Amino acid sequence: FDCNPSEFSARIAANSSIVPLMNQDLIRPLDDLVKKYGKGIQDSQLITIDGKVMAVAFMANTQHLYYREDVLKDLGIAIPKTYEEVVAASEKIRASGKMQYPYAAAYKAGWNLAEEFVNMFIGHGGEFFKSGSAEPNINNAKGVATLNMLKKLSELSNPDYLTHDSEAIKVEWESGNVALMTLWASRSGTLLDDEGDPNITKATKLTGPATVGGGNIPAATLWWDGFTLAKNRPDADAEATFRALAHAASNKKMVADAADQAVWLVEGFVPGPKSIGVIEAVKMGAKPYPMLPQMGLMHGALGSEIVEFLQGKESAEQALKDVEAAYISKAKEQGFL
């Protein structure tokens, strides 16, 4: 995609990946094509940055809670609404002897782990950067509270949690090892399909994302997935590609046929039971993942620098100091600071 000419005419992007594509000047504005060929596309699908349409979104996503209804009922545990309640519920499940590691989330070192920090920090009301600048702003009480909650949850998870991505925790769930889990909404389809233990499938329920630290917005971020078009391709290619993808991204038949595969942003979508996590997140006022040019550098620093804290090798304050130092070095290199 970053060759000239580009090998591909389109690329699927999301909140986190569109900004680097723009920074490298790899994608083109779509305003003219939207005017010409976008009649089926809703305004809410148009991702506008600095006044220009840079992507057309077709689905929404977030991470939210999944729970085993049978396990919670057996132990008289209410459906958790906060991460503090998730911890208490997990401790009760462990004490009952039903499960040794009742909680799971994608804590794989790197991108996944950083995403868990991002969610929890936003839930605590954190702002990643000092107002109006690219100066980091995580080495504070909210950052420490975020790390402490991640540590509590990790202690209730499989000891190999630092290797567990979304696929690995899905396997843990389907094996009956886990009763509470934070996972992407887009994964619900495979958890609720006919494969695997029918008793576990039947007892698998979805609810909104949890809040944390007395906050009133979810400790979660809203995401969109959409298509962008390569700048380094002929205009005729861009036009043909846009027409094909705009047809797909406004296709009511597709949305009806695949209604339970995703939370579609396409007109005519009727949310089903698998959409509950995203719908609840929106109702609760979840914030979108930050579309800031320097956010990728912060995300990268978090994914590598908080591991030692979770392993008990350094303090929360030291870990946050390390994150800021790693971020500052990269941000200076790339001219953000």
Each language-model region and where it sits:
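A structural signal for short loop-to-beta-strand junctions that line the ligand-binding cleft
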Residues: 1-2, 6-9, 31-71, 101, ...
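Hinge/lid segment of periplasmic solute-binding proteins
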Residues: 12-62, 78, 87, 113-116, ...
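Short, solvent-exposed loop/beta-turn-alpha elements that line the ligand-binding surface or hinge
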Residues: 28-42, 102-108, 124-145, 193-204, ...
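Glycine-centered hinge/linker elements that transmit conformational signals in sensory
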Residues: 89-91, 132-162
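C-terminal lobe and pocket-closing loops
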Residues: 186-201, 212-304, 334-336
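Short helix-initiation/N-cap motifs at beta->coil->alpha
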Residues: 83-88, 161-175
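Extracytoplasmic/periplasmic solute-binding protein
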Residues: 49-50, 54-58, 63, 87-135, ...
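Early extracytoplasmic/lumenal segment of secretory-pathway proteins
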Residues: 1-18, 318
